[in-house]
Amino acid sequence: ALAMSSQADRIAFNNCNFRSFQDTWMTSGNDTARHYVKDCWIEGAVDYFYGGGNVLAENCTFYNTRSGAIIVAPCHKDAKWGYVFRDCTIDGNEAAANVKKWGVKLGRPWHNSPKTVYIHTTMNIPISPEGWANMGAIPALFAEYDSRDAAGNVLQLDQRKTEYEGRGENAPKGTSRAVITAEEAATYTYENIIPGTDQWNPRVMMEKLPAPEGLKRKGRQLEWKSVKDATGYIVFSGDRVVGMTRGMYLTLPEYPVMILQVCAVNQYGSLGNKAILSR
């Protein structure tokens, strides 16, 4: 079931979790649309990142939940860049890591002439040697550059799939390169993919404010120093929110709170670095 459907231009996500099984996230059907995805967790099993548009995902984790999982199923027709995953991690549970049964695949071409490129990917679980699968179309480009295993070793990609065949009567046949060059990889940048003619810059919204200084506790009163450009503060105990405030203090609840964390929030709602106080 869908966890996210993002159908507009200029969509950005930072530090979000998207969890489902099949079809977790459907991206825009408009191939001029831009999505920027940073520090996110995307989880699923079958075609769980699919659709069109130009999507740049950086420092994200693609988490696979079954053997034979398939990550992307794009349907780009006229996209300039397609799906671009930079400095991401591919991970999964024990079933997904069982390559002897059905290995995880990077993707398959749903419709049209889809594009997907994985650059500087860390693969914490084994990927099927062929890497990709057939579906309904021939990819314009399904490729990798500098894929590495969990230990940082460069993976050999000579067995990656380059020949594709569609489905049905008179099924199309074609090829796609499985590896791009260092020079090509260097063009798949934030500056080339995201700003466009309107100079959209979602990274500004995601900039982390520094951790509050002077964090201290007096009984149930927690205090800290002001952080420049902060619109508010959030107090955590582990993953649990203890409270939110616009000031530089918070009265703690009566139940014991052992380890406390405080972060500033910028004008766009992005969380800053955390100050930590252990009792």
Predicted feature residues:
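Sequence-level preference for short, compositionally simple segments enriched
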Residues: 1-221, 225-279
